[in-house]
Every structure is written in C-alpha cells, then in structure tokens.
UniProtKB/Swiss-Prot annotation:
Cofactor (UniProt): FMN; heme b
Name of the encoding gene: msrQ
Annotated organism of origin: Pectobacterium atrosepticum (strain SCRI 1043 / ATCC BAA-672) (Erwinia carotovora subsp. atroseptica)
Membrane-spanning segments: 13-33, 79-99, 120-140, 147-167, 169-189
Main function: Part of the MsrPQ system that repairs oxidized periplasmic proteins containing methionine sulfoxide residues (Met-O), using respiratory chain electrons. Thus protects these proteins from oxidative-stress damage caused by reactive species of oxygen and chlorine generated by the host defense mechanisms. MsrPQ is essential for the maintenance of envelope integrity under bleach stress, rescuing a wide series of structurally unrelated periplasmic proteins from methionine oxidation.
Protein name: Protein-methionine-sulfoxide reductase heme-binding subunit MsrQ
Length: 199
C-alpha cells in the first residue's frame, strides 16, 4: 500500500507523541521517586538514550522510504531530527545542572575538554544544533547545495554518539553495544553514498 499525505499526517501525530510522552514519564518519575538511588545519573542516561533512539529513527527513515517504495516517508525525517535535538539538549542540560550544579557551571568547559567522552558528546550536540537551525525550508533555499553537505554530518553524529555512550558507562552492558550495532547497520545501508564521497 502506498502511503498518502493523510497517512503521513497521522504518522506525524504519532511521532510527536513518541517524542513528547517520554518527557511526561520522566517528569512523573522524578516526582514519584521511581528512579534509583542516583536519580541524576538515571535522568542523564534516559535523556541520552532517547536522543540516540530518535537519531537512529531519523537515520532509518531514508532506507524505509527507499526500500519500501514510500517516498512520502521522507517528510517525517525532519520531525524526528528535531525531537532528537530536543532530547540531546535535555541530556546536555541534565548533565550541566545535575552533575555539576548551578554553582559549578563555570567548570563545564573544562569538563568537556578533559573528558574525551564528553568531548564527543558536545561535538555531536553542536552538529545537531547546526542541523536543527538549518532544517527549515527557508534555510535549505538559502544554503543551496551546501545544505545537503552540512546535513550529511548527521552520519558523523551516528558514529560519535554510540562511542560517547559506550565510553560513558562504567560497566559495559548489552544496551550500549546494541545501540552501536544498530547505528553501524544503518550506516552500512548508506555505503553507496559514502563511496561517492570518497571518490
């Protein structure tokens, strides 16, 4: 069945809910004390995983549209990318406020430089910021051919963020490995595009 614009509009509503409802759950979890004895870490990990899930979902759109012969699915990619940036920003803010605290925010720059996994994280966030700012149609028209070159940096984010996650956990568990494998598979699906860049 070929998806229509009506289907896509309904899908967008569901995707907005998928991006927003976890925020309500996060707020409720904090209010009800559902987290562990270290809620600051739990919040950081939850927001980080949400950003990574949405990044992977964003990267999945193009293969689904291409191999499923559903070109209108591409219209969902920007929405997912913006939700990814939203959760990545919450992840950064949660680290700055809950790990360092308001009294030690001045140390943020030093922390980002001295800890390699944080360096990868902030590089990824800065790229996502650039992609979010330039995502509207008006920016696409202004940047012309440079727009696609800029937005290809999402693949760098797909490499850096799983490494950031793997590096940040003290005890290696299956979860970050699975995210890294998922990112690798999605990147391999675009190998033809990468080959064109390297020629």
């Amino acid at each position: 069945m070929r998806l229509t614009l009506q289907h896509i509009n309904r899908l967008k509503v569901l995707l907005h809910l998928a991006g927003f409802l976890p925020l309500l759950w996060l707020i409720l979890s904090v209010d009800q004390g559902w987290f562990s004895a270290d809620p600051a870490k739990d919040i950081q990990h939850f927001t980080g995983r949400m950003a990574l899930k949405l990044l992977l979902a964003t990267l999945l759109v193009t293969p689904l549209a291409r191999y499923g012969k559903q070109p209108l699915l591409i219209r969902c990619r920007r929405l997912l990318g913006l939700w990814c940036f939203f959760w990545a920003t919450l992840h950064l803010v949660s680290y700055a406020l809950l790990e360092l605290g308001l009294d030690h925010l001045a140390l943020l720059g030093k922390e980002l430089i001295s800890r390699p996994y944080l360096t990868l994280g902030i590089i990824s966030w800065l790229i996502l910021l650039a992609l979010a700012v330039t995502s509207p149609q008006i920016m696409m028209r202004k940047l012309g051919s440079q727009w696609q070159k800029l937005h290809n940096f999402v693949y760098l984010v797909a490499i850096l963020t799983p490494i950031h996650y793997l590096w940040s956990v003290k005890t290696l568990s299956p979860q970050p490995i699975l995210y890294a494998l998922a990112a690798l598979i999605l990147l391999l699906l675009r190998y033809k595009k990468f080959r064109q860049w390297w020629r």
